[in-house]
């Protein structure tokens, strides 16, 4: 009797539990909202609900830039090498890029918790260069922040490949700027470099475009040729050599009397000119660098330093870098760009004014776009084709190359003129190669005669400065 009562009670309890289960469990499932999978990128825009804190015992894998390029890591995974236990809350507020795709920042912001922005160093078509403090290595670095536009991002990845190739073979790190790291931050490729001094162009500009002493030009020219020879040995062509892309390693400089201005009154401080305390330089900006086997029919180089074969469209290769070096050496000696122009016909007319007529065999090979600059075979359509009187004056005021150099160089002028004539030969097949130029008497004679290297401190009254 009692056992039947117990069985009835048990069945009643089971029915109640079954009823509750059928009612409550579906209610809980409907009530529970589905959650989206959280993005693993710490710098993403904040979600509506804060993600759960990561477990303290979990150590995530270490990701590096090259793994992203090879596709081993999905794009939404941020390279964890910049986390290293730093708080993820260090991300600055999410700001939209400007209309040109430049990254918008405020001094004091962080690029990942590792890098804090100190100042803006410069801006170009590629993006911006920011001075940052590396919280991990406790050093100041320069970070190139690329615009968030596909073509610039793709060019940046090519530059990273070139930089890693150059760094891998440059054991001493003395020729080209050293890449420290790279990462993708809010759709901006960021390349971390060692911090260097000002460019040769910036130094000239801040020095009122006063020329460098010939001994300093010799040291700068030797290092520049060594850098380019190193690149050419790796079958790389820089294609954009100019004073803006040559950086002094140190920002320190000194003031010395400028004897050219001592005979007449001038404005504040113009009795003196600045000289770098160290002549050490490094080559930068490899975004336009190309390999020997790639197509070489498009336009390269900044206008003032562009070789004639590029303008004529007859194809270019390693020699286009040597032409640019010749133009740079003239600029360092004189303080002014050799060919200050912005149009092809005027540029070719300036070349003929300084270096003589273009060779007919190059003119006859010119592409269709360049045929309009010539008439009656290989004769340049000048001055008839000049667009203005100012253009005519700009060409006519230029002296021949030997006269131009002798206006600014007191000694070693003969060797320098001969070197420049070899670097500025029209026919690229006859132009000096980088290592051939390094063996020129302009560089070797100083060693044979035991001439000491450039000394920026020859005077007892000097003022040490730092840019």
From Swiss-Prot:
GO terms for biological process: regulation of DNA-templated transcription. Residues 447-467 are annotated as: Disordered. Disulfide bonds: none annotated. The keyword Electron transport does not apply. It holds the Pfam family Pkinase. It catalyses: L-seryl-[protein] + ATP = O-phospho-L-seryl-[protein] + ADP + H(+); L-threonyl-[protein] + ATP = O-phospho-L-threonyl-[protein] + ADP + H(+); L-tyrosyl-[protein] + ATP = O-phospho-L-tyrosyl-[protein] + ADP + H(+). CDD domains: PKc_CLK (cd14134). The active site is at residue 240. Residues 115-443 form the Protein kinase domain. ATP binds at residues 121-129, 144. Its EC number is 2.7.12.1. InterPro entries: CLK_kinases, Kinase-like_dom_sf, Prot_kinase_dom, Ser/Thr_kinase_AS. Keywords: ATP-binding, Kinase, Nucleotide-binding, Serine/threonine-protein kinase, Transferase. It comes from the Eukaryota. One of its GO terms (molecular function) is protein serine kinase activity. Activator of yeast transcription factor, STE12. Belongs to the protein kinase superfamily. CMGC Ser/Thr protein kinase family. Lammer subfamily. This is Serine/threonine-protein kinase AFC1. It comes from Arabidopsis thaliana.
């Amino acid at each position: 009797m009692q056992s039947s009562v117990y069985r009835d009670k048990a069945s009643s309890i089971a029915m109640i539990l079954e009823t509750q289960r059928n009612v409550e469990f579906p209610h809980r499932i409907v009530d529970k909202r589905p959650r989206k999978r959280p993005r693993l990128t710490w710098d993403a825009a904040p979600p509506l609900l804060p993600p759960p804190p990561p477990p303290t015992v979990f150590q995530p894998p270490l990701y590096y830039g090259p793994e992203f390029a090879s596709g081993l890591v999905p794009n939404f995974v941020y390279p964890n090498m910049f986390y290293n236990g730093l708080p993820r809350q260090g991300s600055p507020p999410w700001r939209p890029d400007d209309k040109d795709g430049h990254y918008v920042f405020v001094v004091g912001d962080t690029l990942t918790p590792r890098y804090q922005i100190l100042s803006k160093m410069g801006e170009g078509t590629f993006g911006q260069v920011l001075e940052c403090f590396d919280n991990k290595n406790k050093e100041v670095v320069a970070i190139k922040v690329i615009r968030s536009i596909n073509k610039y991002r793709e060019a940046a990845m090519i530059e990273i490949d070139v930089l890693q190739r150059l760094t891998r073979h440059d054991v001493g790190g003395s020729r080209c700027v050293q890449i420290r790291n790279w990462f993708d931050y809010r759709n901006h490729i960021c390349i971390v470099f060692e911090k260097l001094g000002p460019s040769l162009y910036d130094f000239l500009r801040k020095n009122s475009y006063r020329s460098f002493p010939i001994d300093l030009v010799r040291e700068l020219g030797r290092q520049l040729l060594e850098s380019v020879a190193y690149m050419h040995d790796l079958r790389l062509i820089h294609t954009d050599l100019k004073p803006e892309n040559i950086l002094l390693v140190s920002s320190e400089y000194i003031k010395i009397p400028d004897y050219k201005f001592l005979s007449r009154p001038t404005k504040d401080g113009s009795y003196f000119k600045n000289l770098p305390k160290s002549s050490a330089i490094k080559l930068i900006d490899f975004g336009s660098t190309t390999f020997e086997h790639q197509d070489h029919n498009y336009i390269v180089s900044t206008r003032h330093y562009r070789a004639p074969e590029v303008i004529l469209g007859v194809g270019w290769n390693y020699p286009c870098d040597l032409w640019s070096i010749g133009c740079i050496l003239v600029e360092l000696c004189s303080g002014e760009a050799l060919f200050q122009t912005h149009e092809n016909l005027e540029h070719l007319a300036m070349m003929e004014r300084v270096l003589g007529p273009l060779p007919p065999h190059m003119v006859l090979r010119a592409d269709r776009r360049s045929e309009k600059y010539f008439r009656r075979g290989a004769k340049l359509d000048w001055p008839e084709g000049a667009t203005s009187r100012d253009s005519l004056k700009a060409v006519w005021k230029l002296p021949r190359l030997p006269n131009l150099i002798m206006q600014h160089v007191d000694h070693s002028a003969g060797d320098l003129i001969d070197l420049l004539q070899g670097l500025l030969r029209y026919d690229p097949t006859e132009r000096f190669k980088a290592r051939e130029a390094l063996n020129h008497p302009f560089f070797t004679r100083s060693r044979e005669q035991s001439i000491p290297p450039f000394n920026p401190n020859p005077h007892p009254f000097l003022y040490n400065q730092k840019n």
